[in-house]
Amino acid sequence: MSAIVGLDTRATMDLDTTIKGFTLTHEAVLSIFKDVCAVQIDDDVQFEVMGVADIRETDDYPGIRVSLKANYPPISVPLTVDITTGDMITPREIEYTFSMLFDDRTISVLAYNLETVLAEKLEAVLSRNIANTRPRDYYDIYILYALRGAECDKATLRRALERTTE
């Protein structure tokens, strides 16, 4: 969301990622995150894996949530990473570039395109019904359409919504 709408500091409680070509198990995810957290970077931030758990927002949304703690003494911040596999990205993922906060460089990640993000948000609203939908889903739909609606390819959005609701 942040990269799509240009809000680099969008408040969020977690990170979401979809992986390809990987069997999603607690053991494998725990091993990978422990390895990543052990990487030393000269920024005084230390990450600690607190645990892993299954997540199922619906039966069609299996995944694993990794609970982490980011330590930058004296600050300690909890965060989570929700990991899924097999999500349909229509037509394909795209590359986003992020500027580092404390370093004069960028990193690139493959991420959902605008139409797939909108399709997933719309599907969440429709499947949960109005009484159970999270306010941030409505906000995300509004902000995506308000800021990037003119760039949204309607045919791609339709295909993405069809694939998301299969």
State where each predicted segment sits:
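Compositionally biased terminal segments of proteins
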Residues: 2-166
